[in-house]
Regions:
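Residues lining hydrophobic/aromatic ligand-binding pockets adjacent to catalytic sites
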Residues: 2-205
Length: 205
């Protein structure tokens, strides 16, 4: 089956921006302020389970606050969440992101995201503050790279990190930047190895 990137590469025109953000422990006013600062009009919640020990980020409370701020809330955790119930997504008890990405429901989620981004400025939201610590980057954005979006990460202080810079940091945090073997690989193979290694690091951490 063709991957998502294979089906959308020919989309014409300027690429729309897709933001990502981690809610972390922000006050809801601060969180909404970050979204507003960057012109976000729709939030796509990609948490598998939309609950949090921070009550402002539980689904019902979050949706209410966003609605009051004129930001649409869309739950895509069933399609794009990183914690899966499907047994075929696991190898020896460990999540396999490549298998998750091949799920028809995951591909449907990417299509829903594409449709949403045609009408709104969208931010993907999960819990983790740091992009390289979260499946929104290591799974979802990996599948979207080379596709229809300019991916930009909203950091905890409100700053923006382009996804290309996030990938450079990914090479660093996985040790692929200075690895002698990795230096013999093509740039695409190096970043592919870095993504795969980060999945293992997060699973063991």
């Amino acid at each position: 089956m063709a991957g998502y990137g294979d089906t959308v590469m020919d989309r014409s025109g300027d690429k729309p921006t897709l933001y990502t953000i981690g809610h972390s422990n922000h006050a809801i006013e601060v969180f909404i302020g970050l979204l507003k600062r960057h012109g976000v009009t729709a939030l796509a919640d990609v948490r598998s389970r939309p609950y949090s020990r921070f009550k402002q980020f539980r689904k019902k409370e979050l949706e209410r606050a966003l609605t009051e701020a004129d930001i649409a809330y869309v739950f895509l955790g069933r399609e794009l969440g990183g914690k899966r119930d499907e047994p075929e997504c696991y190898v020896d008890g460990e999540k396999d992101y490549a298998r998750i990405a091949r799920l028809p429901i995951f591909q449907e989620g990417l299509k829903r995201l594409d449709d949403l981004a045609r009408e709104d400025t969208v931010a993907l939201m999960c819990a983790e503050r740091e992009p390289v610590d979260c499946h929104r980057t290591i799974l979802i954005c990996r599948e979207l790279r080379g596709g229809p979006f300019r991916i930009r990460h909203i950091l905890g202080d409100g700053g923006i990190e382009e996804h290309e810079e996030t990938e450079r940091r990914l090479l660093s945090v996985t040790g692929m930047e200075d690895d002698l073997f990795a230096q013999q690989l093509s740039p695409e193979d190096r970043i592919a190895h870095a993504y795969a290694l980060r999945v293992r690091q997060l699973a063991s951490g």
